[in-house]
């Protein structure tokens, strides 16, 4: 059973996390450089959910409280829908929320969704998984830090727009699924993003017609690769092959991006 929108939440006066979750948060923030401070807002309180909270085509305004599940991060061991903090159904909006470190799967979207001013204090497996549907998927403001691998995982089709988002200490900001059983043409539009200390800003599957468009207002400091192209596969037992990086017909941007 999932908690439905409108049911009673379990409120807590302080962040209720296990020792492992605290350790994960400390590890994620321990690398903060003197020249960059992750601008996560102050929390207005904390909420620990016993079950995933579903937003069924409506708007949920979290009032800048910190929401978690009271569990330890399991690293890159992939969880399921029941491990998410929020599931946003088609047409739903999640806004003004901090996702705590005491969780595994962050936020899932099932269909078109808007994620507005949502912050992840420490990413576990993924921050945001766009599971199904053809979009549009809109990520407006907010930010994430401490992602060993992906921040935004795009499994459905359509277009993802990421604007005014801050990402720090990360593997990839955006990845079009490289080995999903059902593959689609996917597109990502990145505008005004601040990216610091990462491996890849974007990874796309050019063999499926994916594109990434990155505007000149996006800045990147100590990001090793801005846009990588992969040969994706529909075999989940195979790993996609990276075939190129840099500006192209599929990776649409002007090099170099400005420093943050």
Swiss-Prot record:
Bound cofactor: record note: Binds 1 Ca(2+) ion per subunit.
GO biological process: cell wall organization; pectin catabolic process
Extent of the signal sequence: 1-17
Top-tier EC class: lyase
Gene Ontology CC annotations of this record: extracellular region
EC number: 4.2.2.2
SUPFAM superfamilies for this protein: Pectin lyase-like (SSF51126)
Top-rank taxon, per record: Eukaryota
Keyword match Glycosyltransferase: no
Pfam family, one: Pectate_lyase
Temperature dependence: Optimum temperature is 22 degrees Celsius.
GO terms assigned for molecular function: pectate lyase activity
Cofactor(s) the protein requires to work: Ca(2+)
Cellular localization per UniProt: Secreted
Physiological role: Pectinolytic enzyme consist of four classes of enzymes: pectin lyase, polygalacturonase, pectin methylesterase and rhamnogalacturonase. Among pectinolytic enzymes, pectin lyase is the most important in depolymerization of pectin, since it cleaves internal glycosidic bonds of highly methylated pectins. Favors pectate, the anion, over pectin, the methyl ester.
Family (UniProt): Belongs to the polysaccharide lyase 3 family.
Protein name in UniProt: Pectate lyase H
Lineage summary: Eukaryota, Fungi, Dikarya, Ascomycota, Pezizomycotina
